[in-house]
Amino acid sequence: CWQTYGEYNEDLRNTVIQEFLRYWAKYDFYFYCYAYARIKNKEGGEDVPFLLRPAQVKLAETFERMRRAGKPIRVILLKARQWGGSTCTQIYMSWIQIMHVKSWNSIIVGHQGDSAAEVKDMYVKLITQLPEFLFYEEGIEFDGSLPKIKGGGTSNISLIPSRNCKIKTATAMNPEGARGGDSAMAHCTEVAFWPQTEKMDPQKQVKSSCSGILYKPYTMIVYESTPNGQNFYKDEWDRANGTDDHGERLSAFEPLFVAWWEIEEYRLDPEDMLEWACTLIERRNDKSGNWDYMYWLWTIGATLQGIYWYRQKMKEYADIQDMQQEYPSDPVEAFKYSGQLVFDIYKVEQLRRFCREPVFQGDISGKSPKGEQAVEGLKLFRRKGGELKIWEMPDKTWRLENRYFVSVDIGGKYRTSDYSVITAVSYTHLRAHETRRHL
């Protein structure tokens, strides 16, 4: 105080300390959480500081990596269990609004009104508990007449006057309810459970909620959900994990999954750690009692304490598949037991290892795009990203009838319809050709 201001008194001392704490909270999200964010104590009693758990640190690091790189924050979060992913996301959004950017509106979209309201209530509680000096930048005096947060004229909008920003809630039951805003951040929760009917489409709700969000730094869109079969959320998850024929990512969203073994409460110390470790190694190929699966958990990162907990918890279930459904170890397992799947998703993933690139990719054309001449003068031409893929060219030295079996899966003719897929399989049971079209 003496060096900078030439004097010292209690008020000046407090001002300097508050400014130091504000800068600390601005550039250290983890400090902001523990020092100022308070969450419900699951064991009862008073609220407790928000100390990030390893799974929440993993999520926060994903957000921070994008923010520090000057990129828009886009994440699709697959939740295996309730570990505080929504809480961490919402507190991070509050950190952006309070500490970094003014007039930065946000929206919370839930599959039901109760789910969106619950997330918002937690948000309002957080804002109410923050100290006033965090809301004002250096040199700006506190305005004691302004509440930290207040209603925004309608029941689904709240305002933070000192930061000139809004928090809005909407539901998937009302696809148009999110329109008319200028949000910069969106938290879409339990997306896999959003209704999908002729009148309700999750894609329309996402468009209503997120289409106005610019692709610029500090903007944020998060899809988070537990799995629920094949739907819009599963399609978006697959897109986030996929690349095109040039190796470019298909989605702007980064996929993030947190397995049960990354949640620290799912751990138990064995009576003899060395004996337990030796048992895992000795029985690593033993399929009886699922010991091979126990060892596999070790290879993917589970701790000895975590595997021991899993082994004991598994005894509460008649079948290991019931355990895997409640506590999935990887994304494949998470989707395997959700919804109504025809094929065993693990077996599908095993078959993917034997996939190979086609020897030809492009298109086929005739003398005319339609009509009888469409099948005359057929020619192949290579094109990256073409819909025609050939894995085995015909061997003209062979004279063999009925060499190929051709199947057709009929789709629709509109751009939004399923594709019609034509597959030709040679008598050797190798897929020789596949193409898809809107016919």
Task: Annotate each predicted stretch with a short phrase.
Residues 428-435:
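Conserved small/polar residues in nucleotide/adenosyl-binding loops
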Residues 178-180, 196-197, 415-419, 431:
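Extended hydrophobic-aromatic, low-complexity segments
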Residues 1-408:
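Phosphate/NTP-binding elements of NTP-utilizing enzymes
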Residues 400-426:
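Gly/Thr-rich phosphate-binding beta-strand-loop-beta motif of the actin/hexokinase/Hsp70
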